[in-house]
Amino acid sequence: MNNHVSVLEISGNAIEHNLQYFKNKLHQKTKILAVVKAFGYGSDANKVAYFLKDKVDYFAVAYAHEGISLRKAKITTPVLVLHPQIQNFDEIIKNQLEPSIYNLKTLNAFITHAKEKEIKSYPIHLKFNTGLNRLGFSKVNIPEIMEIICSSNYVKIKSIFSHLAASEDNNERPFTLNQLQNFKEI
Protein backbone atom coordinates (compact mmCIF):
# COMPACT_ATOMS: atom_id res chain seq x y z
CA MET A 1 0.00 0.00 0.00
CA ASN A 2 1.37 3.41 -1.00
CA ASN A 3 0.82 6.01 1.72
CA HIS A 4 3.17 8.51 0.10
CA VAL A 5 0.96 10.10 -2.52
CA SER A 6 1.81 13.68 -3.37
CA VAL A 7 -0.49 16.00 -5.24
CA LEU A 8 0.50 19.28 -6.81
CA GLU A 9 -2.34 21.69 -7.47
CA ILE A 10 -1.76 24.66 -9.75
CA SER A 11 -3.95 27.70 -9.30
CA GLY A 12 -4.51 29.67 -12.48
CA ASN A 13 -5.68 32.60 -10.36
CA ALA A 14 -2.44 32.52 -8.36
CA ILE A 15 -0.31 32.37 -11.51
CA GLU A 16 -2.23 35.28 -13.02
CA HIS A 17 -1.95 37.27 -9.76
CA ASN A 18 1.81 36.69 -9.60
CA LEU A 19 2.26 37.61 -13.24
CA GLN A 20 0.30 40.82 -12.77
CA TYR A 21 2.35 41.64 -9.68
CA PHE A 22 5.57 41.47 -11.72
CA LYS A 23 4.07 43.34 -14.67
CA ASN A 24 3.16 46.18 -12.31
CA LYS A 25 6.83 46.44 -11.30
CA LEU A 26 8.06 46.75 -14.89
CA HIS A 27 7.97 49.39 -17.58
CA GLN A 28 4.77 49.02 -19.60
CA LYS A 29 6.65 48.03 -22.78
CA THR A 30 8.82 45.40 -21.07
CA LYS A 31 8.29 41.97 -22.56
CA ILE A 32 7.61 38.97 -20.33
CA LEU A 33 9.23 35.57 -20.87
CA ALA A 34 7.85 32.64 -18.87
CA VAL A 35 10.26 29.77 -18.25
CA VAL A 36 8.45 26.45 -18.58
CA LYS A 37 11.43 24.11 -18.84
CA ALA A 38 11.75 20.78 -17.05
CA PHE A 39 8.09 19.87 -17.54
CA GLY A 40 7.10 23.25 -16.10
CA TYR A 41 9.19 22.41 -13.03
CA GLY A 42 6.94 19.42 -12.46
CA SER A 43 3.65 21.13 -13.21
CA ASP A 44 3.01 20.21 -16.89
CA ALA A 45 4.61 22.82 -19.12
CA ASN A 46 1.97 22.48 -21.83
CA LYS A 47 -0.90 23.27 -19.47
CA VAL A 48 0.93 26.19 -17.85
CA ALA A 49 1.95 27.54 -21.27
CA TYR A 50 -1.57 27.16 -22.62
CA PHE A 51 -2.88 29.16 -19.66
CA LEU A 52 -0.23 31.88 -20.16
CA LYS A 53 -0.11 31.97 -23.98
CA ASP A 54 -2.06 35.22 -24.28
CA LYS A 55 -0.53 36.78 -21.16
CA VAL A 56 3.22 36.59 -21.93
CA ASP A 57 5.36 37.50 -24.92
CA TYR A 58 7.70 34.51 -24.88
CA PHE A 59 8.30 31.10 -23.38
CA ALA A 60 11.68 29.57 -22.60
CA VAL A 61 12.51 25.88 -22.49
CA ALA A 62 15.78 24.09 -21.84
CA TYR A 63 15.85 21.81 -24.88
CA ALA A 64 14.32 21.60 -28.34
CA HIS A 65 12.08 18.62 -27.49
CA GLU A 66 10.33 20.75 -24.84
CA GLY A 67 9.65 23.48 -27.39
CA ILE A 68 8.40 20.91 -29.88
CA SER A 69 6.00 19.65 -27.21
CA LEU A 70 4.63 23.20 -26.84
CA ARG A 71 4.14 23.45 -30.60
CA LYS A 72 2.31 20.10 -30.65
CA ALA A 73 0.06 21.53 -27.91
CA LYS A 74 -0.82 24.37 -30.33
CA ILE A 75 1.22 27.02 -28.47
CA THR A 76 2.18 29.62 -31.10
CA THR A 77 3.85 32.10 -28.74
CA PRO A 78 7.59 32.48 -29.54
CA VAL A 79 9.78 29.95 -27.72
CA LEU A 80 13.42 30.48 -26.72
CA VAL A 81 15.50 27.28 -26.47
CA LEU A 82 18.10 27.88 -23.77
CA HIS A 83 20.34 24.92 -24.66
CA PRO A 84 20.05 24.29 -28.39
CA GLN A 85 22.11 21.36 -29.52
CA ILE A 86 23.69 21.38 -32.94
CA GLN A 87 22.07 18.05 -33.85
CA ASN A 88 18.64 19.62 -33.17
CA PHE A 89 18.96 22.68 -35.42
CA ASP A 90 16.64 21.13 -38.06
CA GLU A 91 13.89 20.57 -35.48
CA ILE A 92 14.41 24.02 -33.99
CA ILE A 93 13.91 25.65 -37.39
CA LYS A 94 11.08 23.31 -38.45
CA ASN A 95 9.15 24.19 -35.27
CA GLN A 96 9.99 27.91 -35.38
CA LEU A 97 11.86 27.81 -32.08
CA GLU A 98 14.49 30.45 -31.35
CA PRO A 99 17.93 29.34 -30.14
CA SER A 100 19.99 30.89 -27.39
CA ILE A 101 23.50 31.25 -28.74
CA TYR A 102 26.19 31.41 -26.06
CA ASN A 103 29.49 30.57 -27.75
CA LEU A 104 31.24 31.07 -31.09
CA LYS A 105 31.08 27.37 -32.00
CA THR A 106 27.27 27.33 -31.75
CA LEU A 107 26.95 30.70 -33.51
CA ASN A 108 29.05 29.56 -36.46
CA ALA A 109 27.31 26.19 -36.60
CA PHE A 110 23.85 27.77 -36.61
CA ILE A 111 24.79 30.25 -39.34
CA THR A 112 26.24 27.41 -41.43
CA HIS A 113 23.06 25.39 -40.92
CA ALA A 114 20.81 28.34 -41.86
CA LYS A 115 22.93 28.95 -44.96
CA GLU A 116 22.66 25.29 -46.01
CA LYS A 117 18.87 25.50 -45.58
CA GLU A 118 18.78 28.87 -47.41
CA ILE A 119 17.12 30.55 -44.44
CA LYS A 120 17.54 34.29 -44.01
CA SER A 121 17.26 36.46 -40.88
CA TYR A 122 16.47 33.61 -38.48
CA PRO A 123 15.93 35.03 -34.97
CA ILE A 124 18.58 34.18 -32.40
CA HIS A 125 19.19 35.33 -28.83
CA LEU A 126 22.71 35.99 -27.54
CA LYS A 127 23.51 35.00 -23.97
CA PHE A 128 26.31 36.81 -22.14
CA ASN A 129 28.08 35.68 -18.99
CA THR A 130 28.01 38.46 -16.40
CA GLY A 131 28.94 36.41 -13.35
CA LEU A 132 27.18 33.05 -13.21
CA ASN A 133 30.09 31.54 -15.18
CA ARG A 134 28.04 28.69 -16.60
CA LEU A 135 27.32 29.60 -20.22
CA GLY A 136 27.58 32.78 -22.22
CA PHE A 137 29.73 34.98 -24.35
CA SER A 138 32.22 37.32 -22.73
CA LYS A 139 32.50 41.04 -23.46
CA VAL A 140 35.76 40.30 -25.29
CA ASN A 141 33.76 38.24 -27.83
CA ILE A 142 31.67 41.21 -28.97
CA PRO A 143 33.89 42.34 -31.90
CA GLU A 144 34.04 38.81 -33.31
CA ILE A 145 30.30 38.26 -32.78
CA MET A 146 29.53 41.50 -34.59
CA GLU A 147 31.87 40.65 -37.44
CA ILE A 148 30.29 37.21 -37.89
CA ILE A 149 26.69 38.44 -37.70
CA CYS A 150 27.21 41.58 -39.78
CA SER A 151 28.81 39.53 -42.57
CA SER A 152 25.83 37.16 -42.65
CA ASN A 153 22.19 37.67 -43.52
CA TYR A 154 21.22 34.24 -42.20
CA VAL A 155 20.52 35.30 -38.60
CA LYS A 156 19.23 38.36 -36.80
CA ILE A 157 19.71 39.19 -33.14
CA LYS A 158 16.32 39.16 -31.45
CA SER A 159 17.64 39.82 -27.93
CA ILE A 160 20.64 39.72 -25.67
CA PHE A 161 20.35 38.40 -22.14
CA SER A 162 22.20 37.09 -19.13
CA HIS A 163 21.48 34.94 -16.08
CA LEU A 164 22.26 36.73 -12.84
CA ALA A 165 23.93 34.68 -10.12
CA ALA A 166 22.80 35.14 -6.51
CA SER A 167 20.45 38.04 -7.28
CA GLU A 168 17.95 36.75 -4.71
CA ASP A 169 20.54 37.01 -1.90
CA ASN A 170 20.69 40.47 -0.26
CA ASN A 171 24.17 39.64 1.04
CA GLU A 172 25.28 39.43 -2.60
CA ARG A 173 23.80 42.79 -3.63
CA PRO A 174 27.18 44.33 -4.60
CA PHE A 175 27.88 41.29 -6.79
CA THR A 176 24.42 41.58 -8.39
CA LEU A 177 24.93 45.29 -9.09
CA ASN A 178 28.30 44.47 -10.65
CA GLN A 179 26.63 41.90 -12.91
CA LEU A 180 24.04 44.49 -13.96
CA GLN A 181 26.81 46.98 -14.74
CA ASN A 182 28.62 44.34 -16.79
CA PHE A 183 25.44 43.73 -18.77
CA LYS A 184 24.90 47.46 -19.38
CA GLU A 185 28.43 47.68 -20.76
CA ILE A 186 27.67 44.87 -23.18
What are these regions (language model features)?
Residues 2, 7-10, 14, 30-182:
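Active-site-proximal beta-alpha core segment in soluble small-molecule metabolic enzymes
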Residues 15-18, 22, 186:
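Alpha-helical packing segments of well-folded alpha/beta enzyme cores
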Residues 25:
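Conserved PLP-enzyme active-site core in the AAT-like
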